[in-house]
Amino acid sequence: MKNITFWICILIWVFITLVRVIFHQPWFDESNAWEIARNMHFGNMFESVKYEGHFFAWYFLLMPFAKLNFGYPFSMTLINWSFCFASIVVLWRFAPFNNFLKALITFSFPFLACYPVVARCYSIGILPIFLLCVLYKNRLKYPVIYSLLVVFAMNTSIIAFLSSCLLGIFLLFDLFKQENKKDFKICLGIAGIAFFTILIQILNFSTDKLPIAKVFGFNLQTMLSTFVLLNPLINAILLLIFAIGFCVCLFKDKQMFAYVIFVFVAILTLFKVTYSGDFWHYYFLYVTLISACWIAFCEDKISEKCKKCLTYLLCLLSFLLIFDFRNEISVFNSNSKEVANYIKEHKNDCSIFLNQIFFMTLPYIRDGKTDYDIKIIDNSNGTYNIGLDFESIMYNLEPNKNNYIYINSCAKIPNLIKGEKVMKFELDKNIKNLYCIYKVDIEK
């Protein structure tokens, strides 16, 4: 019966997520990672953190496919999906939870709709964290493998770094207490190399390079609506119950109690001082709770009563996340392919791109199946703010009076006046109420 439940759940999960992956069109964050992997080499790989705020592992995995311009977007989305699929299999095979809780986690919004579909660096960080949970009880028997998993998890994203580094510190602390220091020295050497690679990337980090870094302070409303789609007051009460319940039940397992407190404080501090975070970032708090309960159950340092209480809390939290569909449209309907197709149809026009559409459509345009001259796009000087970069826009539009400007808002664009020159915008096409494409004419 246990195997039947697993196969039913996993087959349903595979079908739903693969259908989502097939029809998913990447957003800016996804396509931008592809462009970074395409344009960088191993020597400057660590510099990507200054633009993205995440570490190099995801770009390293994408690099062979991006440089060959092979199979976009499916080579990228299937790599991402494979890591999430492996995480689900590991959960079902090794997690000390009952089948009901495993099913709830499997079909929660993060694991059914977000992480397996949106190809970012987060899914590849969940797998090593789950594998660390599997090895945690026997970490002293397999210290090198455990250490390498920590290093890999730390280099996937800053969020996964905060969620895994303390698990590595726990290993070093336990190895140091042993009489034979050989394993401690080996793992300390691995930790030193990992610290060096992380340090190189952090030293390259600059909040000035991240536009979102200017948004200081985490969004309380976003945080309160991350786990449950209810009234904000009810959300706050439920989150308070979850916080008290998890802390009380995990208190006797000092390491897992410290782990949960550290990760929550570190991630929320990151959102406070660097960037505000969004729902996919806050979902890693959910991953942290799953991991902490997983390890606490295996370590057997808490009572059976606490285990039951934690199971009920995780079931309730996972159940509420199943109905979290408020981000359905924003996650799955970027329509970047439709915009790219429109650009191809007008390949002889000079184009101006506003906001993030240039990078979102670029991999589709550079698909090797068209005679489109990509230099026409590259010569548009990338992303503009109409108000601030008027002179640059005028310079690029001057050779051709009829041009197209792409924006990701359907709001009416006013005519702009600079000296004796007027830019007039005429709506040419509306793509699924997400993008307006305007003809631009310059009058002197």
Regions found by a protein language model. Give the residues of each.
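Short hydrophobic/aromatic helix or loop-helix immediately within or flanking a transmembrane segment
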Residues: 34-36, 42-43, 48-82
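Transmembrane-helix motifs of polytopic, lipid-linked glycan transferases
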Residues: 7-11, 78-100, 247
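Signature aromatic-anchored transmembrane alpha helix within multi-pass, membrane-resident enzymes
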Residues: 6-9, 189-192, 241, 300-323
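Short periplasmic/luminal acceptor-recognition loop of GT-C membrane glycosyltransferases, typified by
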Residues: 328-337, 345-393, 399-414
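Aromatic/acidic, Gly/Pro-rich catalytic loop(s) in extracytoplasmic/lumenal soluble domains
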Residues: 393-444
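Transmembrane-helix signature of polytopic, membrane-embedded enzymes
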Residues: 3-6, 91-111, 126-127
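Short acidic/glycine- and proline-prone juxtamembrane loop motifs at membrane-interface regions
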Residues: 117-123
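Membrane-interface alpha helices of multi-pass inner-membrane proteins
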Residues: 15, 45, 113-115, 130-131, ...
